């Protein structure tokens, strides 16, 4: 019996993905003969199916990228599989990682299906559609490899990336697939696909669809990931990161939002946002009832009664926002110093009760928040704890209302503020960067590439090339957009502080876009989370730690037609050079 290639690709996808049910693949799959006879009329449906896979993929993509970083804090331990991302307690039986793997390979399978069935050169429109497929496939290989593979500077020719499966093998009934490609080979596949996309893409249909600029933006990031560390840079790849960044920055289709508009960035629908290059587009009709609880923003806030609101901005991130001056979120005296602080919304109580908030080290050796009621007596300020003990406060900054307190024999600095509602012991600093897109809800289209990132990519690449003046110009472009006169003075950036200053800006700018943990480890640095929260506050996760990579899902290994090697289960198996 002869099977058409579409069915074979579905079989291949189901075999590769393990837990996926063939019946769950889109019903609009059609035979290769139908497609080849009339490609123009069928391509839209096929492309829609490919893009649809990104919607389910983007949820675990965000969680495994963002939760492993230091921008957020969870209210307490959780039985949800995502808590493993926060706690670094890696296991191979994590359903969210399974979903990330499955959805990623579904997108790869559907993109490959279209590429293999339709010939190039029939028309500009068809070539553009093929370019979209190459973009999605290349992007997906990169995202999968950065989660399941080691940072590129660590022996990429030895460490394993992910399996490369770009079409239907000739012998589908006796299928044997190759083991995981190396990190180097996986990156090469992603680069080749994205360069092919760049060549074929000629029409910009907006940020919900792949475009030439989207391919160039992703190449900018990939080459940055390949550019080594600040201490040992790879100049060839750093220059390529600059080259591809130039192509995007010089494209008149895109521009940075001015400060006032950027403060509302999360509310602007992507098609009206000149900064967005590629997003995973979501629309309100995809959500009904309690669906908003389960969106990305639903863990960060409660909007309109929807959302779990169990994760908040970390003390570390709040301190970074306040570094150039206090951001005052109180309704009666609101003053945003750093535009990015507008994506944070503390849940003040309605009575506007004044407190002195600070972080202290408890008898358990961990950091905790305290909010003590204040009392004013002329120009003197004191506060009272829950046991009725009174403490005099010493003024540090009248403008910012910063004071110090001697508490349990140690001096701590804090601020006068209104009382913020607690979830367990943590003030609810809601994160709304992933909410309110076009409406007051949890609607959000996850951002894959935007222009702000590209300036920072180029800044880092310039720094690794030793061109610090050019790096500073790009760095200040982003700082001055968010902070009035926030740019560093000429000559400030140098070899000694380049990582610190550029990494800090990437954290501020790209927070809650699933970039943070990867940014830390790819440059050979450690992740520390020395701030209040239920996580291990004293742990240093080094870039050499085996937990930097996620485990391959066990279901995928069990169902794989061939050997699918698992990642190391302890540090002894990590290859660094």
Protein language model features and the residues they cover:
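Aromatic-residue-lined binding/catalytic grooves and analogous aromatic/hydrophobic interfacial grooves
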Residues: 201, 213-261, 276, 290-292, ...
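Membrane-proximal, proline-rich intrinsically disordered regions
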Residues: 20-65, 486, 531-577
């Amino acid at each position: 019996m002869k099977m058409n290639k579409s069915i074979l690709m579905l079989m291949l996808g189901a075999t590769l993905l393990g837990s996926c049910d063939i019946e769950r693949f889109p019903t609009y799959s059609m035979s290769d003969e139908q497609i080849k006879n009339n490609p123009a009329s069928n391509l839209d449906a096929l492309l829609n199916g490919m893009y649809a896979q990104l919607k389910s993929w983007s949820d675990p993509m965000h969680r495994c990228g963002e939760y492993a970083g230091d921008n957020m804090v969870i209210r307490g331990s959780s039985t949800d599989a995502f808590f493993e991302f926060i706690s670094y307690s890696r296991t191979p039986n994590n359903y969210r990682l399974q979903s990330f793997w499955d959805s990623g390979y579904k997108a790869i399978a559907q993109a490959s299906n279209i590429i293999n069935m339709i010939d190039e050169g029939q028309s500009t429109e068809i070539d553009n559609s093929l370019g979209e497929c190459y973009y999605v496939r290349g992007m997906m290989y990169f995202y999968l490899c950065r989660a399941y593979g080691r940072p590129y500077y660590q022996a990429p020719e030895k460490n394993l990336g992910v399996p490369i499966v770009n079409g239907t093998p000739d012998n589908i009934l006796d299928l044997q697939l190759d083991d995981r490609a190396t990190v180097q080979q996986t990156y090469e596949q992603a680069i080749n696909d994205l360069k092919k996309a760049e060549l074929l893409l000629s029409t910009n249909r907006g940020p919900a669809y792949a475009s030439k600029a989207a391919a160039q933006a992703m190449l900018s990031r990939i080459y940055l990931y390949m550019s080594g560390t600040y201490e040992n840079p790879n100049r060839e790849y750093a220059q390529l990161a600059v080259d591809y960044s130039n192509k995007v920055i010089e494209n008149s289709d895109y521009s940075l939002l001015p400060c006032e508009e950027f403060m509302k960035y999360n509310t602007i629908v992507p098609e009206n946002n000149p900064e967005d290059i590629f997003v995973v587009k979501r629309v309100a009709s995809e959500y009904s009832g309690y669906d908003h609880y389960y969106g990305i923003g639903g863990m960060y806030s409660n909007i309109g009664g929807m959302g779990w609101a169990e994760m908040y901005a970390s003390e570390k991130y709040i301190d970074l926002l306040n570094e150039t001056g206090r951001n005052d979120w109180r309704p009666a005296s609101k003053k945003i110093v750093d535009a990015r602080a507008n994506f944070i919304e503390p849940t003040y109580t309605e009575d506007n009760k004044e407190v002195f908030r600070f972080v202290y080290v408890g008898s358990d050796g961990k950091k905790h928040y305290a909010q003590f009621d204040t009392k004013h007596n002329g120009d003197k300020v004191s506060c009272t704890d829950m046991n009725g003990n009174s403490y005099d406060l010493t003024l540090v900054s009248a403008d910012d209302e910063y004071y110090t307190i001697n508490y349990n024999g140690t001096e701590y600095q804090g601020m006068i503020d209104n009382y913020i509602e607690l979830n367990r012991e943590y003030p609810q600093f809601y994160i709304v960067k992933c909410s309110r897109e076009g409406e007051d809800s949890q609607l959000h289209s996850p951002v894959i590439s935007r222009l702000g990132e590209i300036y920072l990519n180029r800044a880092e690449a310039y720094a690794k090339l030793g061109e610090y003046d050019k790096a500073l110009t790009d760095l200040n472009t982003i700082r001055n957009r968010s902070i009035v006169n926030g740019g560093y003075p000429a000559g400030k950036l140098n070899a000694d502080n380049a990582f610190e200053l550029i990494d800090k800006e990437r954290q501020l700018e790209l927070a809650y876009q699933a970039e943070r943990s990867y940014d830390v480890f790819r440059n050979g640095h450690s992740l520390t989370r020395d701030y209040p929260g239920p996580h291990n506050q004293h742990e240093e996760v080094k870039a050499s730690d085996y937990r930097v990579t996620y485990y391959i899902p066990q279901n995928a290994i069990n169902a794989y037609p061939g050997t699918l090697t698992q990642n190391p289960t302890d540090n002894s198996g990590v290859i660094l050079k």
